[in-house]
Structure formats: C-alpha cells, structure tokens
C-alpha cells in the first residue's frame, strides 16, 4: 500500500514556483500566448473561483506584482509555457515592467466562474 501511494505521489505531484492557484493562471496565459503569439490586444480569462479566489493576496516569485490581472499579463509576457508550474522561472525586472505595461494598456479581463467548469482556466486572446 505504501508503495502504491508513493507511485501516485510521484505521478501527480509537480514542482511549482509560487502558490499553485495564481501560478496556474500564469501558466494558462503563457500556454495561450505561446499558441497564438503576436501583439496582445485583449485577454479574457475565465477562471474557476475555487482555484484562484485569493489571487489578489499573493505575490508572484521574483516580483512585487499582485492580482489576477497581473497574473494574466505576467504569464502572457514572461511565462515559459514549457516549464509547467515553474512558468515564472525566468522573469526579469524588465519582463515585470513589460507585464505591468500590458496590464495597464491592454484590456485584461478576468471572468470568475462559480460553477463546475471541468477546466480551471480558459483564456481568449
């Protein structure tokens, strides 16, 4: 039984850089931007309330950024989509400034979902 539990943990537990709810939003934004690319004009993120409801209280590693809009912008601008939940491993001060500018100048719109979505983050660019 202990071996079976260890196998499940090895398969399911992944390293994360930061709190997993907000980092999940960053990861979703990085994945979406990687798939679409180009100039960011608008980002709409449909986010499961239960996953990231306290996101405004959590700072992102290596930055002074807080909040869902910043999570979306930071993931889209600086996120490494191949890094999984360590998506922000390469954020620089310059990248942080670029993300702040995107959050300020571009329509970054979070939509909170309170029903069972069967997915946790849905981004539209």
Where do the protein language model's features map onto the residues?
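Active-site nucleophile and cofactor-binding loops and adjacent substrate-binding regions
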Residues: 17-22, 61-67, 89
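C-terminal catalytic/substrate-binding lobe primarily of soluble NAD(P)-dependent oxidoreductases
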Residues: 14, 89-102
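Alpha-helical support elements that line or immediately flank enzyme active sites
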Residues: 22-38
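Conserved small/polar residues in nucleotide/adenosyl-binding loops
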Residues: 125
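Active-site loops and adjacent core secondary-structure elements that bind or stabilize anionic groups
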Residues: 107-114
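C-terminal binding/interaction regions
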Residues: 118-120
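N-terminal alpha-helical transmembrane segments of multi-pass membrane transport
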Residues: 1-22, 39-42, 47-58
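A structural-propensity feature for long, helix-poor, extended segments
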Residues: 42-84, 96-107
């Amino acid at each position: 039984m202990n071996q079976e539990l260890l196998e499940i943990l090895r398969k399911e537990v992944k390293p994360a850089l930061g709190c997993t709810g907000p980092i999940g939003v960053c990861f979703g934004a990085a994945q979406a931007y990687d798939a679409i690319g180009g100039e960011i004009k608008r980002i709409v993120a449909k986010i499961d309330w239960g996953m990231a409801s306290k996101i405004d209280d959590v700072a992102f590693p290596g930055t002074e950024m807080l909040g869902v809009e910043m999570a979306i912008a930071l993931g889209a601008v600086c996120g490494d989509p191949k890094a999984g939940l360590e998506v922000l491993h390469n954020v620089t001060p310059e990248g942080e400034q670029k993300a702040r500018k995107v959050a300020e100048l571009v329509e970054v719109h979070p939509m909170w979902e309170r029903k069972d979505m069967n997915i946790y983050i849905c981004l539209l660019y």
